[in-house]
């Protein structure tokens, strides 16, 4: 266990699945979020504070002396239409979902060596849009663009940067949302029907791609955005 992976938002959902997968691959895993992640070293982090990213990277280097993989997974989603959204909500969403990954990458770069990998967790909503998700969509589209820019700027140093754009994944948040519906069973079936594979995704399926992107098997892969959405974006809707 000599390689170190930092995963933001590693307490649940996709972040926890990534932490488990990297740990199984003999990485030392450190997570960063508001609350500790069970079974993993954690750094308490409020990513709405622009000072936090530098502090988190400094703490990782202090604890381990190195950083090999950065997974930018932490994020927020606030629902409101453009005409109703406050500037504070817009700024908060972009601060956590886009500025924080930028600052984490910026502070991590001096410690990343050739062969290191950055994986940003974007969203299919950076490629399309659901109603009332203007700030979220803008932040994820920006994160995809940042991914390509980092790949271009730092590829000559052997540092790779890719993004994964998940669709509907069975995280705790999404499960709670389904259970809040009047008829959860019917809603779950309807969600399945909008996917060619007729089901929603699992956090572990996203984590499998993330760990592959960090591996030597993906050594010639950089600047790419990978959708993990069961074919949802590929399927045109019918009336």
Question: Where are the regions that the model predicts?
Answer:
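Short C-terminal tail/terminal secondary-structure segment
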Residues: 128, 211, 222-239
């Amino acid at each position: 266990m000599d390689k170190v992976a930092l995963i933001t938002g590693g307490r649940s959902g996709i972040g926890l699945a990534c932490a488990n997968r990297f740990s199984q691959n003999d990485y030392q895993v450190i997570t960063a979020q508001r609350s500790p992640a069970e079974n993993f070293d954690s750094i308490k982090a409020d990513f709405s504070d622009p000072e936090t990213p530098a502090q988190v990277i400094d703490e990782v280097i202090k604890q381990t002396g190195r950083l090999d993989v950065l997974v930018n997974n932490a994020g927020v989603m606030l629902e409101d239409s453009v005409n109703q959204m406050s500037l504070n909500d817009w700024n908060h969403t972009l601060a956590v979902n886009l500025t924080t990954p930028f600052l984490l990458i910026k502070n991590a770069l001096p410690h990343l060596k050739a062969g290191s990998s950055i994986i940003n967790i974007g969203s299919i909503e950076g490629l399309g849009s659901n109603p009332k998700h203007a700030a979220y969509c803008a932040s994820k589209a920006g994160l995809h663009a940042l991914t390509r820019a980092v790949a271009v700027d730092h590829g000559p140093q052997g540092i790779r940067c890719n993004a994964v754009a998940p669709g509907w994944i069975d995280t705790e948040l999404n499960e709670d949302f389904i259970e809040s519906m009047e008829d959860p069973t019917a809603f779950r079936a309807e969600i399945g029907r909008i996917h060619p594979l007729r089901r929603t995704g699992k956090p572990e399926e996203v984590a499998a791609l993330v760990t592959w992107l960090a591996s030597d098997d993906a050594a010639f892969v950089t600047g790419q955005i990978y959708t993990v959405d069961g074919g949802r974006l590929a399927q045109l809707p019918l009336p």
